[in-house]
């Protein structure tokens, strides 16, 4: 009940501002009042192996909550089994003009067109070095807006090279709808070229550092069955370590007539649940358990978390559900899956 009171106050603010203030508050140490309401519930130990790594539990943060790795320690206190930071790019960039995030409150949805706003990969590395979290940190990487699609692989390779020694796993974001033509990297020759080069770089760095860092590809929920089958074949062919399903959707049809429904950008939250879960089901069949799936999109309850896992996800992630239901949702999910 306490969180829903706080939520009413937060929802009076512009969404991006509310997000910033919430994380800043989380980052303040030694607040006994805050600890009582948010950290009190005991979380069961449920370790699981995925991508060759041991996760404390199946639930992690989705990319976007902590773009620059400034709140790793604070988020870890909430009980997450892993933290995924980013999306970060080789160089800092401001992203798209504000306002660029909008709530669809009646549907528990969020539309965003952030545009990979971040302080760059070097800043993220400094923040990871400063953190005390001993669990798994995934690093989600993307390309700079100024980098052409033809040269985009270079941006991913730069980020992989720099972050390799500091990441538990690396997530390749080629599915954000808010960077022009980025989703084209999911298709044909561009996709094959990307997979070949990042796998080659991974092998080089594995040999150099004697450390294997898994690589996951994050895909769109707006792909057809045929496209998902084709993607699955290439993921298997190039021995990619995992697939993250899914990013936000451009399909706003479920929001017809609602406030903010006409805003451009990717839709996340509850309206994405069915679409992302369906994508997981198709991937699960086409991947034949050769590559694990990390499920994300619309998880707002124990049941929706279970749906992702029953559809084939090994790990799951949340973001919008946390906005609408608060930190206690984390503990409920972990203790019941």
UniProtKB/Swiss-Prot annotation:
Q: Where is the active site?
A: 176 (nucleophile)
Q: Which residues bind FMN?
A: 63-67, 87, 140, 173, 218, 246, 269, 298, 319-320
The molecular function terms of the Gene Ontology recorded here are: dihydroorotate dehydrogenase (quinone) activity
Q: Which GO terms fall under biological process for this protein?
A: 'de novo' pyrimidine nucleobase biosynthetic process; 'de novo' UMP biosynthetic process
Give the Enzyme Commission number: 1.3.5.2
Q: Which UniProt keywords apply?
A: Cell membrane, Flavoprotein, FMN, Membrane, Oxidoreductase, Pyrimidine biosynthesis
Q: Which residues bind substrate?
A: 67, 112-116, 173, 178, 247-248
Quote the catalytic activity from the record: (S)-dihydroorotate + a quinone = orotate + a quinol
What is the cofactor note?
Binds 1 FMN per subunit.
Indicate the segments annotated as coiled coil, or none if absent: none
Cofactor needs: FMN
**Where found?**
Cell membrane
Give one Pfam family, short name only. Answer: DHO_dh
What pathway does this protein act in?
Pyrimidine metabolism; UMP biosynthesis via de novo pathway; orotate from (S)-dihydroorotate (quinone route): step 1/1
Membrane-spanning residues: none
Top class in the EC scheme: oxidoreductase
Topology in the lipid bilayer: Peripheral membrane protein
Description of how the protein assembles with itself and partners: Monomer.
Q: Which HAMAP family match?
A: DHO_dh_type2
Read off the PANTHER family from this record.
Answer: DIHYDROOROTATE DEHYDROGENASE (QUINONE), MITOCHONDRIAL, DIHYDROOROTATE DEHYDROGENASE (QUINONE), MITOCHONDRIAL-RELATED
Q: What is this protein called?
A: Dihydroorotate dehydrogenase (quinone)
Native species? Buchnera aphidicola subsp. Acyrthosiphon pisum (strain APS)
């Amino acid at each position: 009940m306490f969180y829903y009171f706080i939520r009413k106050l937060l929802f009076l603010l512009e969404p991006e501002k509310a997000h910033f203030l919430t994380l800043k508050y989380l980052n303040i140490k030694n607040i006994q009042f805050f600890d009582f309401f948010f950290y009190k519930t005991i979380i069961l130990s449920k370790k699981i192996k995925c991508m060759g790594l041991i996760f404390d539990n199946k639930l992690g943060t989705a990319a976007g909550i902590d773009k620059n790795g400034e709140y790793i320690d604070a988020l870890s206190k909430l009980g997450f089994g892993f933290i995924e930071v980013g999306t970060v790019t080789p160089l800092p960039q401001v992203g798209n003009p504000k306002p660029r995030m909008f709530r669809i409150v009646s549907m528990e949805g969020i539309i965003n067109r952030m545009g990979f706003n971040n302080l760059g990969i070097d800043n993220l590395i400094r923040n990871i070095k400063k953190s005390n979290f001993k669990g798994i940190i995934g690093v989600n990487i993307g390309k700079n807006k100024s980098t052409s699609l033809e040269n985009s692989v270079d941006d991913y390779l730069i980020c992989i090279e720099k972050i390799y020694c500091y990441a538990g796993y690396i997530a390749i974001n080629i599915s954000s709808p808010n960077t022009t033509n980025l989703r084209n990297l999911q298709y044909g020759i561009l996709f094959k070229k990307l997979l070949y080069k990042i796998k080659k770089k991974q092998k080089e760095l594995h040999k150099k550092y004697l450390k294997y860092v898994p690589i996951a590809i994050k895909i769109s929920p707006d792909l057809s069955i045929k496209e998902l089958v084709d993607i699955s074949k290439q993921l298997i062919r190039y021995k990619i370590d995992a697939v993250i399903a899914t990013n936000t959707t451009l399909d706003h049809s479920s929001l017809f007539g609602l406030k903010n429904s006409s805003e451009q950008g990717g839709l996340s939250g509850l309206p994405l649940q069915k679409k992302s879960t369906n994508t997981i089901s198709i991937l699960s069949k086409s991947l034949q358990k050769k590559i694990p799936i990390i499920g994300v999109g619309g998880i707002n309850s124990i049941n929706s978390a279970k749906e992702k896992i029953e559809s084939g996800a090994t790990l799951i992630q949340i973001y919008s559900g946390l906005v609408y239901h608060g930190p206690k949702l984390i503990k409920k999910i972990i203790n019941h899956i």
